[in-house]
Amino acid sequence: MNSKTPYKTVIGLEVHVQLQTETKLFCRCSTQFGAAPNTQVCPVCLGLPGSLPVLNSKAIELAVRAGIALNCVIAPFTKWDRKNYFYPDLPKGYQTSQFDLPICGGGFLEIDTQDPLSGQPIRKRIALVRAHLEEDAGKSMHDEVAGRADSRIDLNRAGTPLLEIVSEPELSSAEEAKSYLTEMRLLMMFLGITDGNMQEGSLRADANVNLHFERDGKTVATPIVEIKNLNSFRAVERAVLYESNRQFVLFQETGLAIGQSPKQTRGWNDVAGETEMQREKEDSADYRYFPCPDLVPVVLGESEIKISRAAATTTPAALRKSLVETHALKPNEAETLIQQGRGVVEYFENLVQEGASPKRATSWMLQDVLRYLNENNASIETYPISAASLAKLLMAIEASKLDTTRGKEALGKMIGQPGLSVEKAIESLGIAQVDTSELESLCMQLLTENPDVIDKFRAGNNKALISLVGPAKKKNKNVDPRQVQEICQRLIESGTF
């Protein structure tokens, strides 16, 4: 509860992460997105009589990796259970999941948010209940064809491995829910657990929302509502905001508290911008869980866990700290690099390792490299210039062999001619070193032509000399702006002018 609302919003998220495996959880069917409907199916994922599932060990490895990164306790013994319910896109009539012995227990994820009282930025730890493996359902598609309702089922997705990560109800606003989902997606993508493509359904979320009111010294809670069909950060934020307002109005009208009205499952209508009633929410007993007789339990040894632990060491949180503390990046600069993915951060680190200064490397990464990637819809892996070559160019600028403007021209040459060396790129620009005496003569000419700059500098405006760089470049495009300012300053301070 804060000063803006008479209630406290309580939110828990269930994030469904589609694991990045080549085949499904219990069969060899491909998980590739975009295939023709119902072409990536077999007797196992269709649930045909006599078919038997075989566990995909890669899914276990990725689930353990995620659990370690989320600070969970990894279960040495876990098993499979059947979750029984009927839905058109669930061909077997049950979902193979994990009920009482999930592969990952507890854990937490830290997010950036604001203190509700002071408004200051803080780091908040959100506790997790569990993370368990299960198979995905198929996909129902509803269209209007020739004026009639047309519903079709695509079972290509049925059997794809999912990791469902359940948080405690510790999120307090729509903004926090969005921040949590953003950080979760980033972490899962960084570790190669999912591709994180929300448009393709690789990461989806359900939100459990209710409100807490203070009445006569007691907390009164509204019935919990689960919101389905949240497939974007904006959808999560909008749905939680809408549902909070809806529950507030409903509570004002009815006064019904938790336990006095059934839990609901509501779907999010992104076009209408509202939640819509789907059904009363089921309890675990309604699913009639029982152990799957076709699958043996999973027993994890320390050797299997060790493999996943080694792959979970480089997290976004660890990289944020390294970029800020080791390379002196500003927090917003570090965040921008991290949001681009692990490959971009590694490219930056390689630049510094090859000898580029962190400050200049940051500037060129944020401006030139990322601009190229965005304009060409490219990944850092396809960027035409290696980190070693770009570092060599940046070091040439540091050594005053060329200035930043000419350096960007050289960069353009190297992009246009992949494989062109830094030396050849600089040579192709016709850059020649300007003799010191020639440069001093040029600076004397500049000061003679611009006496107002001398007056401004003597009056304490140290940046006045920057205005001489443009005229200097017109006289000789190869001059170094830094040297121009240094020589002009020396000439003024020595009394020459």
Regions found by a protein language model. Give the residues of each.
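Basic, nucleic-acid-interacting segments
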Residues: 1-314, 325-327, 331, 353-357, ...
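Amphipathic alpha-helical segments in well-ordered regions
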Residues: 66, 243, 364, 368-372, ...
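Core structural elements
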Residues: 201-213, 287, 324-349, 358-376, ...
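Extended, non-catalytic structural segments that build the interaction scaffolds
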Residues: 304-311, 318, 349-354, 390-402
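Structural motif
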Residues: 328, 352-361, 401-402, 459-462
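M16/insulysin-pitrilysin zinc metalloprotease superfamily fold
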Residues: 354, 361, 369-384, 392-397, ...
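Strongly charged, low-complexity linkers/loops
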Residues: 381-395, 404-475
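Short, amphipathic C-terminal "tail helix"
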Residues: 463-497
